[in-house]
């Protein structure tokens, strides 16, 4: 393969009340967001990332709150999770997202994104269709990777 999966980057959790879950993370676990909240307008979502220790490369938790009652996250919570907060996706960090997508397309793996797009934190991201694995998987290349130099 022309790419490597480096680690689990983050786990995405869809939540009905982003402010409430942020307060729970602070009060119960003593965690503050590792990045400022970011709204992705075209996806109707606000994201809030938490990691156990800002000094490590530990896997983060991404909480996703819908900015509209009919946004993708709100629909996911209602349809897929019975109206409750829950697991939405796993993000895998890759060393070269363009090589990864080319390899997956050559293997005819179903993709939501055939080309990367900019996600939260300026990362280059793309999603595999759940038909590929039974899960929603996100591929993430962090700033500084090969696709940022093209």
How does the language model describe each region?
Residues 2-6, 20-23, 27-28, 32-35, ...:
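Intrinsic disorder/low-complexity detector
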Residues 58-59, 69:
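Arg/Lys-rich, alpha-helical DNA-contact motif
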Residues 45, 56-58, 82-87:
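Short connector loops at helix/strand junctions that flank enzyme active sites
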Residues 2-4, 15-23, 38, 48-51, 59-61, 68-73, 77-131, ...:
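Vicinal oxygen chelate
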Residues 30-56:
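Acidic (E/D-rich), amphipathic helical modules within compact regulatory domains
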């Amino acid at each position: 393969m022309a790419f490597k999966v480096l680690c689990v980057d983050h786990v995405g959790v869809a939540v009905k009340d982003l402010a409430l879950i942020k307060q729970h993370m602070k009060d119960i676990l003593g965690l503050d967001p590792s990045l400022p909240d970011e709204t992705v307008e075209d996806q109707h979502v606000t994201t809030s990332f938490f990691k156990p220790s800002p000094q490590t490369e530990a896997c983060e938790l991404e909480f996703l709150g819908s900015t509209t009652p009919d946004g993708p996250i709100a629909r996911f919570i209602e349809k897929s999770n019975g109206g409750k907060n829950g697991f939405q996706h796993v993000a895998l960090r890759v060393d070269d997202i363009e090589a990864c997508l080319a390899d997956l397309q050559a293997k005819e793996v179903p993709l939501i994104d055939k080309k990367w797009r900019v996600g939260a934190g300026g990362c280059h991201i793309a999603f595999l269709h759940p038909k590929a694995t039974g899960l929603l998987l996100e591929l993430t290349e962090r700033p500084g990777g090969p696709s940022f130099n093209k």
